[in-house]
Design a protein with these regions (language model features):
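Intrinsically disordered, low-complexity proline/glycine-rich segments
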Residues: 1-171
Length: 171
């Protein structure tokens, strides 16, 4: 399953669609005005599926992930020089190195500029590949997800990293 989204400028208080490879809307992401970023993910019928919410009053950015009203985990920016690092505590997820994530056996490796990610399972099977198309006015991500069951969590992971990057570039 492939998902595509194009983030628009100033979209944190707006909404944008997440498309499948045929151009059909699969999810709708809506930004809400709040202290810190708050992004809600809806299906096409308007049912809320997930939330990415920035915690405020933290020294470094931290985002909590929810599926429906259930807390899934959080993604925290770590202090580092030259290469961004994150600590991911989500259903047993753990980060080793800059973009090494372990969640239920999943691992995520990413590039220096945070444009490309590869997610693999405990047995080495591929969970998803996330890439950023660079020749656009706004960020355009392609999420190639092997099992559609993982689509929401993969999407929320990308939304949280993108929100942190947006905060970093606006400072």
């Amino acid at each position: 399953m492939k998902l595509l989204f194009r983030q628009r400028f100033f979209s944190w208080f707006d909404s944008y669609d997440i498309y499948d490879e045929d151009g059909n809307t699969v999810y709708v992401v809506k930004g809400q005005l709040s202290w810190g970023h708050c992004l809600k993910v809806f299906d096409t019928s308007g049912q809320e599926l997930g939330t990415v919410k920035e915690k405020i009053l933290t020294w470094l950015p931290k985002f909590e992930l929810y599926e429906g009203s259930s807390y899934v985990g959080c993604i925290s920016k770590e202090l580092s020089f030259f290469k961004p690092r994150y600590d991911i505590d989500c259903c047993g997820w753990h980060v080793e190195g800059s973009f090494r994530l372990d969640c239920r056996g999943w691992q995520v490796d990413g590039s220096f500029l945070e444009w490309d990610y590869s997610m693999t399972g405990a047995a080495g099977e591929q969970v998803a590949v996330i890439s950023k198309e660079i020749f656009h006015m706004t960020d355009t991500y392609v999420l190639d997800i092997v099992n559609p069951v993982n689509a929401l969590r993969v999407l929320m992971f990308v939304l949280a990293i993108d929100a942190e990057k947006c905060s970093r570039s606006s400072n």
